[in-house]
Every structure is written in C-alpha cells, then in structure tokens.
C-alpha cells in the first residue's frame, strides 16, 4: 500500500480473511440522535458512529440547545432530551456539510417550533456545494401543506433554506416518494409532534422502503406507533411526545459491511459482526444478493459470514438496497456473465450522481458498461484484463470503498481522495488492508 492525503494505491490481493466489527450505522446514528433530542428523558446511545455526518448532526443539536456528553472514543453519547420542539435565537445558521441524514430530518423537525416570546424568527440550513445540488423540494412542498413557512435562499428546490417557527398543523399531506425515502422519514419523525393528526399519502412509487422500516421501528422504540397502510398511506396521531428508551444500541452499518462481504465472495472468507439476521437495516439483504450470485452465506443473530463461491452475473431490481447495490457494480467484474442493476434512479441524487460516476470509473479499469437512466449493465473481466487506473471518488465515500475491490484482480488500483470515507467509515482502508494478503 502507498498512501498519502491525496491518494492510496492498493496492490493486488491474493485473498482476504478475518473478522470485522462494524462501525455504527449512519442512518441509525442520526435518527437516534434526533429522536433522543426531541424525547422526554435521558438516552444513552451506544456504538454511535464517529463520522462527518454524525458530527454535523451533533453540532447542529448543540446549537439548538441540546446538552449531551460524548465518550472519549465518541461511540457512547448521553443526551438530555428536550421533551419538546427545538427553540432558537433568530439569525442562527446550521452548517450540515453533505449530510442528507441531517439536512432532511432537521428540516422537518425545525418546522415544529412555534413562535416564542420573540415572536416569529428564522433559522437557516446550509451545507457544502454538493448539498446545494441535492433536491429537497418534495419535502418542503409536503411540510408547507402542513403549515410550514420555508424559503429557498439560492436555487428553487435546493438548500440553503430558511425556516420560520410557525409550527406544523398536521392534516392531510401528499408527498412524492419516488426520489428519496429520506423525505418521508423526515416527515414521519416530525408528524407525532404536529398540532393535529397527520395522514401522509405517497405519490408515485416509494423508493428504498427498508429505510422507512428503520424509521418506523425506531419511532416505535421511542414510544410512537404509526399506522402503515401498504406504504401508500401513513397515519400518525398528533400532539404526542417521544419517550426515551433510556438506552439504544446502534447496529453496525450494514452498508459498510457490503465491501468486506463482497471481497470475501470474490476471494476469501470474512465474518462481520454488529449486524445479523435480526437487523432492522434493509442493506443486510445485500448478503442474499451475493448468495444468488453464488457465494456461501452463514447468518447469526449478530454476524454475517461470507465465503467465496463461483460468482455468476445477476439481473435484479435493487431499489431496496440502493447504497449496498453500488458494491454489486464492482463485484460484477469478477462474476461470470453480465450483471444488470435496475431501478436505481435515486443513485443520481446521492452524494454525487452515482450512476454516471460508477459507469465512468468502471470503464477506466477496462470494463464494458452501459449506463441507462435508472439502470447499469456491466460485463465482467478476466483477472488479467483489469487495467490500473486512478479512480475519482467525487467526494463520495461509497465510490472510494467500492473501488477497493479492484485490487482483488491482478492489478493495483489508485483511489483519489481516500479521506472521503470519513463520511461513514474513517478507518475503512486500514480495516480492509488488515484482512488482506498480498499476491506473492
């Protein structure tokens, strides 16, 4: 391995073997922080992820008057719940980096605030340049139906936004579910604290349903039940208060597990702990995709183990695992026969346009790729056909981690800006290399 701040080169790997304790899930960490802040009582979160996205959420909560204590290794957080909506001084601006899991839920939660003795005031939510390209209009439109006052400060439909503390009335709300499940997650988490009951109707086909399951299960843990009518309509009683569960264990990140599990499916045997058959994360189903391709899978309550098999290409709708599906795109190069990943339009509105980015970088290593509007078709390569390439990562943690798998060929790979993995897995490359054995 050759590593500096701007690039890391991974030399050819002959096999991978070992055990990985997964860092906490980003999706669960930021949901748990927000629910703990709004709940009545003190909550101790364990196995919290220490990453950029979580840091942005923690900083925002501190600015909003939430008190918490973090352990030295930042994996345990004790939060004093407010037991009410947030309040703020007029003129406050929250910088949320490129953290969609902070921007979307906070947008909805801040709309719950009602005029205080200062009367109506505003709060601004902003972030990195890429955040200003990530759509938020479907969420804003839905919140405005419930009485929110939100203004776009630059480009219509995108952050930065200003929110006024007018409160959320509840009522009947229609929301487009076809771009991002985070919009619905944000609305669901705010709805119990609205003034009246809320009926949320989904327009279009709801994407990434397993992420909605995470939200509903976590709301239940914090004392709130939602009636889910076949993912088309959600009924939420208003005027409720979240109750602290006192302790909440953040599961290991199933999306982060995908890189190690895929590497094992190609060339070895790896056990990941912190996520298992009872996980509430949809990305645990990534292991089922590897099994369909020919890998050998063993499930435990708190682990998934994968052992290599003769991998075959697959043609599959992967809308239910959009983040982990990226890992299938690089795994496909090592399978026999073509792979088609379908119904993944929402790759285009993530940290970067992941469909174009993935197609571009796969071609650099020698692959034949067809990029569709909402699918990608990938032809495999023989181990000797891989070409050395410098992989652009587009400030996208998942691009960097996916392309580590290229080193399982007979060719080294150089990954630019490897520190972008700090978004969810700051120690990824060290952890990955600890399990690998070099080609002799």
From Swiss-Prot:
Its recorded reaction(s) are: 3-phosphoshikimate + phosphoenolpyruvate = 5-O-(1-carboxyvinyl)-3-phosphoshikimate + phosphate
Q: Which Pfam families match?
A: EPSP_synthase
Residue numbers binding 3-phosphoshikimate: 26-27, 31, 180-182, 208, 323, 346, 350
Instruction: Identify the InterPro entries for this entry.
Output: Enolpyruvate_Tfrase_dom, Enolpyruvate_Tfrase_sf, EPSP_synthase, EPSP_synthase_CS, RNA3'P_cycl/enolpyr_Trfase_a/b
* Listed GO biological process terms: amino acid biosynthetic process; aromatic amino acid family biosynthetic process; chorismate biosynthetic process
Record CDD domains = EPSP_synthase
Gene Ontology terms: cellular component: cytoplasm
Gene3D superfamilies to which the protein is assigned, alphabetical? Enolpyruvate transferase domain
Which pathway does the record list?
Answer: Metabolic intermediate biosynthesis; chorismate biosynthesis; chorismate from D-erythrose 4-phosphate and phosphoenolpyruvate: step 6/7
The enzyme's E.C. designation: 2.5.1.19
Q: What is its main location?
A: cytoplasm
Residues bound to phosphoenolpyruvate are: 26, 100, 134, 182, 354, 398, 423
Q: Name one GO molecular function term.
A: 3-phosphoshikimate 1-carboxyvinyltransferase activity
Q: Which PROSITE patterns match?
A: EPSP_SYNTHASE_1, EPSP_SYNTHASE_2
The answer to whether UniProt assigns keyword Membrane to this entry is no
Q: How is the subunit organization of this protein annotated in UniProt?
A: Monomer.
Per the entry, what this protein does is: Catalyzes the transfer of the enolpyruvyl moiety of phosphoenolpyruvate (PEP) to the 5-hydroxyl of shikimate-3-phosphate (S3P) to produce enolpyruvyl shikimate-3-phosphate and inorganic phosphate.
Please identify the protein, giving its name as recorded.
3-phosphoshikimate 1-carboxyvinyltransferase
* Higher taxonomy: Bacteria, Pseudomonadati, Pseudomonadota, Gammaproteobacteria, Pasteurellales
